[in-house]
């Protein structure tokens, strides 16, 4: 054992559950750009409330959204504004924490910290504008991973719909 050297480690974790307990008159509150967030009794704070993307129709090349995210049997729509909204995730992680080490030798110390989180979702807001099918002309250029990587022919199974200038859908 060296009296000039010490090594200290610390570990912590926190389970968080931030739920909306009560709202005035028990009514949901939608807020944020496009009312994309939802406060609802019993749900997590910062719940994402959005139309749910189904995918690209391989025959038409149009993007499809579920008409009712909570009941897929009601079918799909191509127009984002006609799609029903549903809970598609939450921003808050379930668990957060950290792990640190400190090494000390005489009057010199070296420390590092590693943080982590599990759970929670992320909404790529800039990506909302750069991954489009022509509907947001003039707002931003297409993202590099969309350029050339979209529906071209019937039967194509792709992630990005056919680009249509000033897309009415």
Where do the model's predicted regions map?
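Internal catalytic or translocation cores that form aromatic/hydrophobic pockets or channels
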Residues: 3-5, 12-17
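Residues that define the transmembrane beta-barrel architecture of outer-membrane proteins
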Residues: 5, 93-97
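Membrane-embedded beta-strand positions of outer-membrane beta-barrel proteins
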Residues: 9-11, 112
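Surface-exposed, extracytoplasmic segments of Gram-negative outer-membrane nutrient-acquisition systems
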Residues: 18-92, 109-169
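Generic recognition of flexible, low-complexity loop/linker segments
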Residues: 87-88, 97-100
